[in-house]
Amino acid sequence: MGKLVALTLLGACLALIGERLLNFRERVSTTREIKATEPQNCHLIEGLENGSEDIDILPSGLAFISTGLKYPGMPAFAPDKPGRIFLMDLNEQNPEAQALEISGGLDQESLNPHGISTFIDKDNTAYLYVVNHPNMDSTVEIFKFEEQQRSLIHLKTLKHELLKSVNDIVVLGPEQFYATRDHYFTSYFLVLLEMILDPHWTSVVFYSPKEVKVVAQGFSSANGITVSLDQKFVYVADVTAKNIHIMKKHDNWDLTPVKVIQLGTLVDNLTVDPATGDILAGCHPNPMKLLIYNPEDPPGSEVLRIQDSLSDKPRVSTLYANNGSVLQGSTVASVYHKRMLIGTIFHKALYCDL
């Protein structure tokens, strides 16, 4: 009898794992023909060769770019080099990327920047918040931006037990931000198991000096996050679920779901067009090529624009699409005055006029 029970349980477990493996394959093996779409006057940005995972642009047109991310399971073209933060001035006729010098107590050799977000205080001082993965841990680094010197001063490192496996961040006040956790576990084996079983345990965390709490959960893999222009709604990308969650922000910083927009492609980072309020999404149209990288058959890139996101019928259009021949593994697109920057996990970055 005992052996029969054991065999029954084993069979049930194997059946569950088999079903979950098929489900995982379905989620990440999207293979569809990419119809090339390119705005006028696009060119690769010189000096950005090792990824440009996230981009955030100040209202003045200064764009911060995080580069050199080393992420488990993803390719890295310069695995032994620390990450950098670059700056581009989109007011210039021919903007160029320059690496920002960093001063302060940060161990720059362990800089492994992921999501970034800017905040401007009442005296117009700009601060850059950076999700960092030193030795594959998760911290949030706070920098003060010195515009005249074009440099960053490291002010503080934030750590918390809820800030584990952090992917992206959106800052709404001094040391007040939402952060996404793309995995519940942190060990590589358990992360793989989590990806296969897909328990929907990832979440959005609110951080402040007085309170840190989970404000939304139940995502397959919470990824990019941003906020509407009026700061009433928070947009969360659920990458492997291929959708965007629109959440209402309350005075106590809690989030409640409003709607979900299905996109049919893996959604990475999100930004908002400051001129229109439209959501821009950096996407992965053929994600299996990210996991099994072949330079002869590279992953493509895709940027979607979502208009009227709160309406019954949001309008989704393609701003950029490429099969990987130009740009591989797009993660983010950010715009300023009809100029668009597109970043990638490990590849290059693209500038386009819209």
Swiss-Prot record:
Gene Ontology molecular function: acyl-L-homoserine-lactone lactonohydrolase activity; aryldialkylphosphatase activity; arylesterase activity; metal ion binding; protein homodimerization activity
GO process annotations (BP): carboxylic acid catabolic process; establishment of localization in cell; lactone catabolic process; negative regulation of superoxide anion generation; regulation of cellular response to drug; renal sodium ion transport
Entry binding sites for Ca(2+) 1: 53, 167, 223, 268-269
Cofactor(s) for this UniProt protein: Ca(2+)
Top-level lineage group: Eukaryota
Residues glycosylated per entry: 50, 269, 323
Protein EC: 3.1.1.2, 3.1.1.81, 3.1.8.1
Intrachain disulfide bonds: 42-352
Main location: secreted
The UniProt record lists the keyword Metal-binding: yes
Sites bearing Phosphoserine, chain numbering: 165
Keyword Hydrolase: yes
Cofactor note as given: Binds 2 calcium ions per subunit.
Active site per database record: 114
Positions that bind Ca(2+) 2: 54, 116, 168
GO cellular component, as recorded: extracellular region
Family affiliation: Belongs to the paraoxonase family.
Primary role: Has low activity towards the organophosphate paraxon and aromatic carboxylic acid esters. Rapidly hydrolyzes lactones such as statin prodrugs (e.g. lovastatin). Hydrolyzes aromatic lactones and 5- or 6-member ring lactones with aliphatic substituents but not simple lactones or those with polar substituents.
PANTHER family: PARAOXONASE, SERUM PARAOXONASE_LACTONASE 3
The protein, known as: Serum paraoxonase/lactonase 3
Species this chain originates from: Mus musculus
